[in-house]
Amino acid sequence: MAKQYDVLFRLLLIGDSGVGKTCLLCRFTDNEFHSSHISTIGVDFKMKTIDVDGIKVRIQIWDTAGQERYQTITKQYYRRAQGIFLVYDISSERSYQHIMKWVSDVDEYAPEGVQKILIGNKADEEQKRQVGREQGQQLAKEYGMDFYETSACTNLNIKESFTRLTELVLQAHRKELDGLRTRASNELALAELEEDEGKPEGPANSSKTCWC
């Protein structure tokens, strides 16, 4: 039976409550959009497998609550993330200003070298815009991040942004990936991961790897 994926890692969505993190996640994983807003309680996640340069990448995407009362819980997930989306709402100057606080949290709690992308979400709400595209680009430049304006409503830059962060994580781990390729000959890697889905651990010869 063909293996389901070659490598697995975690991505994290962080940002203020109401910026559309859950909508981004649902659009990317399920191609669904729900206009009604229900705040995430604590942490939720979804899975998706994509192909990047011939590598089957299994992504575990964590959606964190933005409310202050959940911060102690959500910060625990920073430590095991390989990639992080910092999300603000283009119609909320406040959420944009708070990105500095979220960056500070990443610097404190996430592993060194974690890959980051800045997202200006709800780009479909142009008539409500409070944050210019140039502001987002400038902030991303200051922090050394790629930048995308997205819309879960219209599906703008959803696949592109998730694929880009996946590429950045793969590039950051290219040395490990090449080493695993060498040791495993024609197979990509050898490692096991319980995917937080309640699945039992697989046999020792499964050809998968995880940077978690």
Swiss-Prot record:
Gene3D superfamilies: P-loop containing nucleotide triphosphate hydrolases (3.40.50.300). It catalyses: GTP + H2O = GDP + phosphate + H(+). Regulated by guanine nucleotide exchange factors (GEFs) which promote the exchange of bound GDP for free GTP. Regulated by GTPase activating proteins (GAPs) which increase the GTP hydrolysis activity. Inhibited by GDP dissociation inhibitors (GDIs). A motif (Switch 1) lies at residues 31-45. The modification Cysteine methyl ester is found at residue 212. SUPFAM superfamilies: P-loop containing nucleoside triphosphate hydrolases. InterPro entries: P-loop_NTPase (IPR027417), Rab15 (IPR041826), Small_GTP-bd (IPR005225), Small_GTPase (IPR001806), Small_GTPase_Rab (IPR050305). Transmembrane segments: none annotated. Keywords: Cell membrane, GTP-binding, Hydrolase, Lipoprotein, Magnesium, Membrane, Metal-binding, Methylation, Nucleotide-binding, Prenylation, Protein transport, Transport. Residues 192-212 are annotated as: Disordered. A lipid is attached at residues 210, 212 (S-geranylgeranyl cysteine). It is an enzyme of class 3 (hydrolase). Its main location: membrane. The keyword Plastid does not apply. It is a lipid-anchor. The small GTPases Rab are key regulators of intracellular membrane trafficking, from the formation of transport vesicles to their fusion with membranes. Rabs cycle between an inactive GDP-bound form and an active GTP-bound form that is able to recruit to membranes different sets of downstream effectors directly responsible for vesicle formation, movement, tethering and fusion. RAB15 may act in concert with RAB3A in regulating aspects of synaptic vesicle membrane flow within the nerve terminal. The GTP bound form of RAB15 interacts with REP15. Interacts (GTP-bound form) with MICAL1, MICAL3, MICALCL, EHBP1 and EHBP1L1. Switch 1, switch 2 and the interswitch regions are characteristic of Rab GTPases and mediate the interactions with Rab downstream effectors. The switch regions undergo conformational changes upon nucleotide binding which drives interaction with specific sets of effector proteins, with most effectors only binding to GTP-bound Rab. This is Ras-related protein Rab-15. It comes from Mus musculus.
